């Protein structure tokens, strides 16, 4: 009688893909963090007398408007990152280039819609802080090449 020994190989290191959470989970968390940060910036600026109005005495942007718009546009960025993760040849660099370009474009209204200087500076700061939270978080989840 002969016995056959079957060897099975086991890996002690988990597969990096299986251990990582998907892009969207980190993106949603970063979006919420960015919304909180931009709302805090708006609240601090408002407390310091910044109006966020395009004309003197006109209605300004409410602080919760910062949270709402930050969430909406950050989640659009999460969707872009998810699509680029599946379709782009170089997802990380494609996403970073696109996000930087969109961040630069996002400050154009702050400079051209007639905001006073403190309002424009606060809005640009809010855009920059939101991008500084969301973009590196998403870029870190994307692979360099597909």
Name each region found by the language model.
Residues 34-46, 74-82, 107, 131-136:
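Transmembrane alpha-helical segments of multi-pass membrane transport proteins and ion-pumping complexes
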Residues 49-58, 114-118:
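Membrane-interface helix termini and inter-helical loops of multi-pass transporters
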Residues 63-82, 97-105:
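Core segments of alpha-helical transmembrane spans in multipass integral membrane proteins
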């Amino acid at each position: 009688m002969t016995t056959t020994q079957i060897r099975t190989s086991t890996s002690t290191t988990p597969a990096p893909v299986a251990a990582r959470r998907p892009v969207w989970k980190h993106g949603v968390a970063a979006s919420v963090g960015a919304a909180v940060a931009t709302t805090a910036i708006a609240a601090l600026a408002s407390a310091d007398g910044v109006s966020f109005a395009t004309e003197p005495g006109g209605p300004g942007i409410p602080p919760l408007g910062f949270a709402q718009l930050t969430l909406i546009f950050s989640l659009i960025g999460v969707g872009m990152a998810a699509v680029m993760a599946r379709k782009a040849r170089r997802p990380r660099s494609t996403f970073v280039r696109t996000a930087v370009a969109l961040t630069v474009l996002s400050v154009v209204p702050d400079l051209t819609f007639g905001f006073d200087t403190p309002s424009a500076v606060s809005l640009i700061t809010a855009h920059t802080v939101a991008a500084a939270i969301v973009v590196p978080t998403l870029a870190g989840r994307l692979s360099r090449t597909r």
